[in-house]
């Protein structure tokens, strides 16, 4: 009897110690703002597991089954502001094998945990200055967060043709062209060798420029970078984007990724790479369309 009473008492104590938070699903595990509004932090972990099965079919029966289970993504994301809501930050860490693989002599043969480490300063009006490691203003499919995909992954085409992340600075601005017509301008100068590089700049720099046109105004909840139309846009919304990227004296096979191109004498081979994107995002009443070139 004593054991039953003790267990019941501990259970009641545990229940009474729980606190009810006003945070809802999708808004982060922790969402904290300092009492004096000097800083804020939101912590939002997420993961994606995947199972794949395949069989050979010879016309009569299925055979040779193969199965694969993986943790496709495992992320820890922190964001908020410091000192002022105009000075924001974002830190995102990757923990899955696909996130951290790619160690080489240029990142001291260490796991590549850091996906994003960037500060974003709204220094005047519609102007923002970004500094650190984050996604470049490239094709819309790549810039859409993996948490906001409609299918389980991005397209196979995107996996080969994108400019991903890099270390550098970005200047961003938006201009009202009349009525609800909005234009956004994004410019970037970065190191050109991808994320988590620690051993200096082996090649030249990478330059990126992107223009986005929203003739019918902004999307609900930044829906132009969210593949599904979960907000069900009542009026048609369209974004047209154009990106130009130039990686001068690139020393990796794909500029930001791939093997470093080593000559037989141990020196690095350098080549100029140019990438051009044109893309569109359209949404209306639950229907969404995304196209890229």
Q: In which residue ranges do the predicted regions lie?
A:
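Short Pro/Gly-enriched beta-strand edge/turn motifs at strand-loop
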Residues: 56-58, 261-262
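Short, surface-exposed charged micro-motifs
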Residues: 22, 118, 279
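Short, charged, low-hydrophobicity "junction" segments
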Residues: 16-24, 183-189, 263-265
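Bacterial Sec-dependent N-terminal signal peptides
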Residues: 1-20
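Outer-membrane beta-barrel biogenesis signature
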Residues: 17-43, 58, 218-237, 250-253
């Amino acid at each position: 009897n004593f054991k039953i009473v003790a267990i019941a008492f501990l259970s009641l104590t545990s229940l009474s110690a729980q606190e009810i938070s006003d945070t809802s699903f999708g808004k982060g595990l922790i969402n904290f703002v300092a009492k004096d509004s000097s800083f804020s932090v939101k912590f939002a972990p997420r993961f994606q597991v995947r199972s794949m099965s395949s069989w050979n079919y010879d016309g009569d029966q299925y055979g040779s089954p193969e199965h694969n289970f993986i943790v496709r993504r495992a992320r820890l994301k922190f964001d908020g502001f410091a000192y002022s809501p105009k000075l924001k930050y974002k830190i995102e860490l990757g923990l899955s094998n696909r996130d951290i693989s790619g160690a080489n002599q240029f990142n001291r043969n260490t796991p590549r945990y850091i996906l994003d480490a960037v500060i974003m300063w709204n220094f005047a009006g519609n102007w923002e200055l970004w500094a650190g490691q984050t996604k470049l203003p490239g094709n819309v499919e790549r810039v859409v967060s993996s948490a906001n995909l409609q299918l389980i992954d991005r397209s196979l085409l995107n996996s080969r043709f994108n400019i991903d992340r890099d270390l550098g600075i970005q200047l961003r601005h938006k201009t009202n062209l009349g009525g609800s017509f909005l234009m956004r301008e994004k410019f970037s100068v970065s190191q050109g060798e991808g994320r988590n590089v620690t051993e200096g700049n082996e090649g030249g720099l990478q330059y990126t420029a992107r223009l986005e046109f929203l003739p019918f105004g902004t999307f609900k909840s930044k829906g132009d970078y969210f593949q599904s139309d979960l907000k069900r846009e009542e009026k048609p919304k369209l974004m047209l984007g154009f990106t130009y990227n130039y990686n001068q004296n690139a020393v990796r096979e794909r500029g930001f990724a791939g093997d470093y191109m080593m000559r037989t004498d141990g020196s690095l081979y350098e080549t100029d790479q140019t990438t051009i994107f044109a893309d569109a995002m359209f949404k209306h009443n639950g229907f969404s369309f995304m196209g890229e070139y």
